[in-house]
Amino acid sequence: MDTNTLPPKPSISPSIASSFPTVKPFSSQNSTTSNPELSHIEKESNASSIIISQQPLSPSNISSAAPLDETHIATKASASLRNNNVSPHIPSPSSFSSSSSSDLDKSMLDEKHPDSEDITAVSLSTPPFPESIDVARFSSEEKKILSRIRRKLDLRIITCLWITYFLSRSVTYSISLSLTMNKHQGHSLLQTVSGLNYHTLSVGTGLSYVSLIIFDLPSNLLMTRADPRLWLSRIQVTTGIIGACHAVLGTKGSSASGFIALRFFNGLAIAGMWPGFAFYTSRFYRDQHLGKRIGWYYTAAQISSVATSLLSAAFQKMDGLHGLYGYQWMFLIWGVVAFTQGLFLPRWLPCIKHNQHNEKWISWIRIPKFLGFLKASENTGLTPEEEEVHAIYMAEMQVGKSWTLTDLADAFLDVRLWPPIFMFFGVVGISNGLVNYSSLIISEINENFSSVTVSLLVAPIWVFDAIAILTVLPLHDRFHKKMLFFVGSCLFVLAGLLITTFVSNVWGRYVGLLILGFGLGPTVPIIMTWVSSAMGPSHGDVGVAAGLAIVSGLGNLGSVVATSALYSGWKADTTFRRSNETMCGMVGIAIVASIVMHMVQKFNIRRFPFKRIYACLSERRKKELSVT
């Protein structure tokens, strides 16, 4: 158990400090009857009251405190702040659960009240009371306000992210479709680019995921230092530019090396988008409301796959128009639309409000007056009352908390970060393998299918994927059984792979692909929600940003395996049977990792047995605290 993980204690103004109640530490002789002030507090059990237990403070009873949710949310510090119209930032009980009792006592008793040596003045960054804390409940009116807040945020955030992800995935998914477009006319991507074959295709696709893995973490960490809206806008704009540049493929000077370079830069441009979406969303929604919202905008990937599959049939009709192949028109149109939409992201998305003094490196970009309509919005769209309630609702997530390299290292060494990597490895490898090679897999099922038929048969796979997201994730948020829902989804994936691999009937194998798509749908949103809820209360912004980026980045090694070593990258596997069998093994890895994650959280395991490393981190943290 780490004994040096307390956050630094900032200075606090007298006006705010006076809003905190002062409480004498309990002794063994104290009782409710001998303490009139405590008796009075315990009698106030309405919606905004708080009960202070007489149980002595210890790390065990702090860590066992129930997690804050909509019905258990505000500590006495938050209630006091609310009464004084101050936006609170309340530390999570879990944020100091790994500290020793002596360290907690020292940190909470180092400021003395002028009238008594036994009374503490509570800091905003330390636990408000030297006793175990029970929490108040939101009133029915506040619950209505929270529902209204979520509806307002959904309209701006989820709508914007859905469209952004839809266009981004359309740009990416167009590569897969271009492999078979106008094949019978000899105008597919494979037939018109000199030197491009299945091997170079696998190399290019694999390199796109390599660049994604390398740049996911720095891209997501920048979101804690820059305005996330500006960074997401940069990602979408560059994705559109690189997507449109794919139209040069098929011209006289194009080659396989040009395709490989474009795929690498596409991965570089898009790096940080998916974990960035999850990070941004987690700054507005708590765990019990986050999963289905990630699922909502994740359906954009599935709908995009359907839309691009259907629209590719129309693009094939444009083949030869103005001297361009059908796939060149597809790259150009999707790229330009994505670029244009990316310019409006800062204006569309609400800003993240917090009361931390965490200055952003980039919070605005100077633009000409005639482009003033693109300027980033400076409000959340909420009323002051709604912002106050939302601040209490999000208090445990430590939104806007500043961080150092020591905090980043501490997040990396959190045990809860690593099982989701293997979960992501398994399911995303399969998902991206299906995205990139679905048209080839269907063509292998029946070689007599035309290119248009193949494009149309791809679409229902992603319809089933979207249906699963919309039906499973609301149940996941309601019952909070992450492992159960994840393992159940993985079993659907496994069943789909086995049917597609071993059934001889053509349409039976296609049904296996539909089952596979249904199982894949809920897996990624569950993983991202799991990581955010585990890392946010303990590590703040840096924990969520780094955790999501590491899981997404290293987990995409599964995509490298699926796109480079399997399917078209496995020359001897002409029927894709061995590739599907390998995918079954990857599903097994994901299932085992989810069980490990469940056990790690059940037994509250957060640290590896690396005593020397944690000792070094503790010393470094002490030096940082002494400087501040």
From Swiss-Prot:
Family annotation (InterPro entries): MFS (IPR011701), MFS_trans_sf (IPR036259)
Biased segments, Basic and acidic residues type: 103-116
GO MF annotation: an example: solute:proton symporter activity
Annotated membrane-spanning segments are 157-177, 203-223, 230-250, 259-279, 294-314, 324-344, 417-437, 454-474, 483-503, 511-531, 542-562, 583-603
Superkingdom per UniProt: Eukaryota
Where is it chiefly localized? membrane
The UniProt keywords, alphabetically, are:
Membrane, Transmembrane, Transmembrane helix, Transport
Q: Show the CDD domains listed in the entry.
A: MFS_FEN2_like
One GO term describing the cellular component: plasma membrane
Q: How does it sit in the membrane?
A: Multi-pass membrane protein
Q: Where is the composition biased (Polar residues)?
A: 25-37
Protein's cellular compartments: Membrane
Q: Where is the composition biased (Low complexity)?
A: 12-21, 48-64, 87-102
Q: Which stretches does the entry tag as region Disordered? A: 1-65, 80-125
Per the similarity annotation, which family is this?
Belongs to the major facilitator superfamily. Allantoate permease family.
Q: Can you say what this protein is called?
A: Uncharacterized transporter C1B3.15C
